[in-house]
UniProtKB/Swiss-Prot annotation:
Encoding gene per record: rsmH
Cellular component aspect of the GO annotation: cytoplasm
EC number: 2.1.1.199
Pfam families: Methyltransf_5
Descriptive protein name: Ribosomal RNA small subunit methyltransferase H
UniProt entry keywords in alphabetical sequence: Cytoplasm, Methyltransferase, rRNA processing, S-adenosyl-L-methionine, Transferase
Length: 304
């Protein structure tokens, strides 16, 4: 494993996820979350002369990890545009699509990116540094009710309305620009025993809103459903309940809402067959080596 790969992000469930893709040497594959390139390198190691891999990442920092391989094409884009770029590269159907939905260690460990409450720095949280609103924009400009909804829906925080009220009151005196300033405002709401867990939920909610993660995931999953050929695999690693619910729904019902449809005879209509009825999780050895993998869940579905 290359040094830049391990410092940028340690690939989670590497063997399990790539095995699940059922790689054929001459197949066409997509890694929609390239990141440190760990999964992509493993996929490429299994391809032959006719094989092809597209790797997506919207973060310009990921470009430092680009694989020098004639079978690999890097796409600097949000994976929500999967359909567009498959057409652009003249790819009809693909054999498997892999998505590791975890935030790269690089993002959490880079204080300038603003993803972690462990460091002071700007309230940013953008995956794509060239576009979109920042976390500071959210906490300084959103109406109180909208802020509360974000914390409730994306962070599953029970005190979301109190949290939003405190933030709105604080920003009337001075704009909230740094993580340190933000923590001073919200930390008094939590006891020491709950502090880390609650802060993690708050930062997750802001990150999801800033990057429109749920909307992007929905669009990618729908595009993946269309792009896979019969027998093709959708392989997804999730880390929190919101994204896991969406992935589980599309694999079971063919839509992210989980609405079931039946044919004339009452049989469930779905584009997928579940490969693993029980989620695959990291073993104790992997969690020891990479504690950030502890919440990972691997789901696999095969296109009918």
């Amino acid at each position: 494993m290359k040094e830049e790969e391990t410092t940028y992000h340690v690939p989670v469930l590497l063997k399990e996820s790539v095995d699940a893709m059922n790689i054929s040497p001459d197949g066409t594959y997509v890694d929609v979350t390239f990141g440190g390139g760990g999964h992509s390198r493993e996929i490429l190691s299994r391809l032959g002369d006719g094989g092809r891999l597209l790797g997506f990442d919207q973060d310009e920092d990921a470009e430092r990890n680009i694989v020098n391989d004639p079978h690999f094409t890097f796409v600097r884009s949000n994976f929500r545009y999967l359909h567009n770029f498959l057409r652009y590269h003249d790819i009809g159907e693909v054999d498997a699509i892999l998505a590791d939905l975890g935030v790269s260690s690089h993002h959490f460990d880079d204080s300038e990116r603003g993803f972690s409450f462990r460091f002071d720095g700007k309230l940013d949280m953008r995956m794509n540094k060239r576009a979109g609103i920042t976390a500071a924009d959210v906490v300084n400009t959103y109406e109180e009710e909208r802020l509360a909804d974000i914390f409730y829906l994306y962070g599953e925080l029970k005190n979301s309305r109190k949290l939003a009220s405190v933030i709105v009151k604080a920003r009337t005196g001075q704009k909230i620009e740094t993580i340190g300033e933000f923590l001073e405002i919200i930390k008094p709401l939590f006891g020491r025993e709950r502090e880390k867990k609650e802060l993690a939920k708050i930062f997750q909610a802001l990150r999801i809103e800033v990057n429109q993660e749920m909307e992007a995931l929905k669009e990618m999953l729908m595009a993946a459903t269309e792009a896979l050929k019969p027998g093709g695999r959708l392989v997804v690693i999730t880390y929190h309940s919101l994204e896991d619910r969406m992935v589980k729904n599309i694999m079971k019902t063919g839509n992210v809402e989980g609405k079931t449809t039946q044919d004339f005879f009452g049989n469930l209509q779905t584009p997928f067959r579940l490969v693993n009825n029980k989620v695959i999780v990291p073993d104790e050895d992997e969690i020891t080596r990479n504690p950030r993998s502890r919440s990972a869940k691997l789901r696999i579905a095969e296109k009918k």
